[in-house]
From Swiss-Prot:
ATP-dependent RNA helicase involved in 40S ribosomal subunit biogenesis. Required for the processing and cleavage of 35S pre-rRNA at sites A0, A1, and A2, leading to mature 18S rRNA. The keyword Hydrolase applies. ATP binds at residues 70-77. The gene is FAL1. Residues 238-399 form the Helicase C-terminal domain. One of its GO terms (biological process) is maturation of SSU-rRNA from tricistronic rRNA transcript (SSU-rRNA, 5.8S rRNA, LSU-rRNA). GO terms for molecular function: ATP binding; ATP hydrolysis activity; mRNA binding; RNA helicase activity. This is ATP-dependent RNA helicase FAL1. A motif (DEAD box) lies at residues 175-178. It is found in: Nucleus, Nucleolus. Keywords: ATP-binding, Helicase, Hydrolase, Nucleotide-binding, Nucleus, Ribosome biogenesis, RNA-binding, rRNA processing. It comes from Candida albicans (strain SC5314 / ATCC MYA-2876) (Yeast). The Q motif is unique to and characteristic of the DEAD box family of RNA helicases and controls ATP binding and hydrolysis. It catalyses: ATP + H2O = ADP + phosphate + H(+). GO terms for cellular component: catalytic step 2 spliceosome; FAL1-SGD1 complex; nucleolus; preribosome, small subunit precursor; small-subunit processome.
Length: 399
């Protein structure tokens, strides 16, 4: 794991009201963490805490309910993972921490981060996700898992089957909370919460926290500490954003092909709004002899895992996906995101383009728009206090 771009991370400003009185820890040593955890942090590649880590880790360790917001790629996963690992009793094999995520890929990724950070602590962790045989979960849970990372549907299933014992869970983490609190997951999260001990600590984490999400968190949290980014700081300053005006929807494909002839990139992600469009675009690109892979929520989990692993290893260069990939998935080499379709909601814009500038690295986002999209693009600019420029004629100037 590469280190952060310190200059970029230092630009992040937190709301004074929300962080008043919170001590900022400039080093991991000053947090007095377990020696084996500290060893795991350094082995993972961290040297000094990022802005969110320096503020939120100790709040989580203190046992307070915590609401933490920061940009994509600034180490949010490690923030709650470190806080959680510090309070785990390694002598007990009971489940003590539960992490809920909106996508299977994100749940697996979090499990991997926890595994690496807890490498020297002999931590047992399992990803509990749909799309796989529940028998595998039952077997793993019977062996004893101190930390479970999962998607709400499968987690509530194993709780109801009594395979996942909840009596010793100390901390519940809701990652990408804005997505989790949408209709599909809300009821499942309430259901899970009802099975947890009344004393459970709740940690809410997301890159964006709209007012309605903050209102919903009040049902789960008691006097939470809020570590929130200033509204005008919720932008990705390390990412250059452009748009290409296409007269009609069917001109987008030719524009995309033209872009590919000119761009020299390591890896790229192209986002479409529907599974149908993903399949169509992947087929069209392959007909033009472009090497691409496609991923969406209707695929079997094994197929999704295989595509993700290939993409992570760099075996495939271009991934076409729906928003299933936009949430928190960390592939270091991605330097370009193309929105073939603009996202249907403002919150997903930052999640999508954040894939191109992980951990402070520079990235580029290109939006293909028709005249019908102009108003939406202007709304995104206003919402994120950012400027999306028209792409210059010479594409190499922007890469």
């Amino acid at each position: 794991m590469d280190d952060f771009d310190r200059d970029l991370d230092n630009e992040l400003e937190f709301s004074h009201k929300s962080t008043k009185g919170i001590k900022v820890h400039r080093t991991f040593e000053s947090m007095n963490l377990k020696p084996d955890l500290l060893k795991g942090i350094y082995a993972y590649g961290f040297e000094t805490p990022s802005a969110i880590q320096s503020r939120a880790i100790m709040q989580i360790i203190s046992g307070r309910d915590t609401i933490a917001q920061a940009q994509s790629g600034t180490g949010k996963t490690a923030t709650f993972s470190i806080g959680m690992l510090e309070v785990i009793d390694t002598k007990s094999k009971e489940c003590q921490a539960l992490i809920l995520s909106p996508t299977r890929e994100l749940a697996i990724q979090i499990q991997n981060v926890v595994k690496h950070l807890g490498d020297y602590m002999n931590i047992h962790t399992h990803a509990c996700i749909g799309g796989k045989n529940v028998g595998e979960d039952v077997k793993k849970l019977q062996q004893g898992q101190q930390i479970v990372s999962g998607t709400p549907g499968r987690v509530i299933d194993v709780i109801k089957r009594r395979n996942l014992q909840t009596r010793n869970i100390k901390v519940l983490i809701l990652d990408e909370a804005d997505e989790l609190f949408t209709k599909g997951f809300k009821e499942q999260i309430y259901e899970i919460y009802k099975h947890l001990p009344p004393s459970v600590q709740v940690v809410v984490v997301s890159a964006t926290l709209p007012r309605e999400v903050l209102e919903m968190t009040s049902k789960f949290t008691t006097d939470p500490v809020k570590i929130l980014v200033k509204r005008d700081e919720i932008s990705l300053s390390g990412i250059k954003q452009y748009y290409v005006q296409c007269e009609r929807e069917d001109w987008k494909f030719d524009t995309l092909c033209d872009l590919y002839d000119n761009l020299t990139i390591t890896q790229a992600v192209i986002f479409c709004n529907t599974k149908l469009k993903v399949n169509w675009l992947a087929d069209q690109m392959k007909k033009q002899n472009f090497t691409v892979v496609a991923m969406h929520g209707d695929m079997k989990q094994d197929e999704r895992d295989s595509i993700m692993n290939d993409f992570r290893r760099g075996n495939s260069r271009v991934l076409i996906s729906t928003d299933v990939w936009a949430r928190g998935i960390d592939v270091q080499q991605v330097s370009l995101v193309i929105n073939y379709d603009l996202p249907t909601d403002k919150e997903n814009y930052i999640h999508r383009i954040g894939r191109s500038g992980r951990f402070g690295r520079k990235g580029t986002a290109i939006n293909l728009i028709t005249k019908d999209d102009v108003v939406t693009l202007k709304e995104f600019e206003k919402y994120y206090s950012t400027k999306i420029k028209e792409m210059p004629m010479n594409i190499n100037d922007i890469m």
